[in-house]
């Protein structure tokens, strides 16, 4: 309020009957060319030290103070005691006995659907300019306070209001300064998630990935019956296979305690270790059988040419009596 109103103290001293007080002056935008200072007198007499209030509100025509009618002297009617700083509004007469002036004479807005606003800020329904309305009912106190509770149109004084058009009241009835302002989409960039900023190599290493075969799905047979799904085969990692092969090299058969210990070390269960050793023993027996057959075949192929060229067999055949003597 200090940017629009200025308080000028022109008090001359208060106790010796001198008139002292405060002069309330508005900025030039509040007054028209024909504005004249008007003395505002409260409805009750002020005490010592309280001066009159002078305002620069524009008046259409000057109203002379009507003189009281001449008649027989009457005893003054006692007035009820009023508080020292009772509110004195502008809606009544400026001077005692003067007729109340309409709101149009002071350049104030009247009440109507176009200017019916629930808050202190508003605009006309059919106007595009910035019109800020303040209250017309003013309250003055002895200390120089100035309160507003009605509506004043800055557009009536020929200048735009001090507030921009973005603070105008929306059509739904909520005040402009109190409504929630939502930013435009894309105005505030969204922070990237921490998982998206990290590269894929830092989240999972290659050696952590254990390749598993996809489980087989049951297929429909010719008669529409589904075949039972086969058991899922466990894919061991390189580290697990190395440890199992090393253990199999020393022990072909494991005890239950040793099997549980190996399963805990390799993050496997007891059944997986047991089945692996069974399959490994069967593979070893198969290799041995294949190896024995290959060894026997190689030995037979080596001994066969030696038996054909043996001198003993050839001498026996040559020196045999059946072959030496033939019947004549």
From Swiss-Prot:
- Tell me the DNA-binding residue spans: 229-288
Q: Which GO terms describe its biological process?
A: embryonic skeletal system development; neuron differentiation; sensory perception of pain
InterPro entries named among the record's database cross-references:
HD, HD_metazoa, Homeobox_CS, Homeodomain-like_sf, HXA1/B1/D1
Q: Which domain of life is it from?
A: Eukaryota
Q: Where is this region: Disordered?
A: 304-328
Pfam families from the entry? Homeodomain
Ranges of Polar residues composition bias in the record: 307-328
Question: Mind telling me which PROSITE patterns this protein's record contains?
Answer: HOMEOBOX_1, HOMEOBOX_2
Its localization reads: Nucleus
- Keyword Membrane found: no
- One GO MF term, please? sequence-specific double-stranded DNA binding
GO (cellular component) term, any one = nucleus
Query: What keywords are annotated for this sequence in UniProt?
Result: Developmental protein, DNA-binding, Homeobox, Nucleus, Transcription, Transcription regulation
- Give the residue ranges of motif Antp-type hexapeptide: 204-209
The record's similarity note reads: Belongs to the Antp homeobox family. Labial subfamily.
Record PANTHER family: HOMEOBOX PROTEIN HOX-D1, HOMEOBOX PROTEIN ROUGH-RELATED
Its biological purpose is as follows: Sequence-specific transcription factor which is part of a developmental regulatory system that provides cells with specific positional identities on the anterior-posterior axis. Acts on the anterior body structures.
Protein name (Swiss-Prot/TrEMBL)? Homeobox protein Hox-D1
Taxonomic source organism: Mus musculus
The gene is Hoxd1
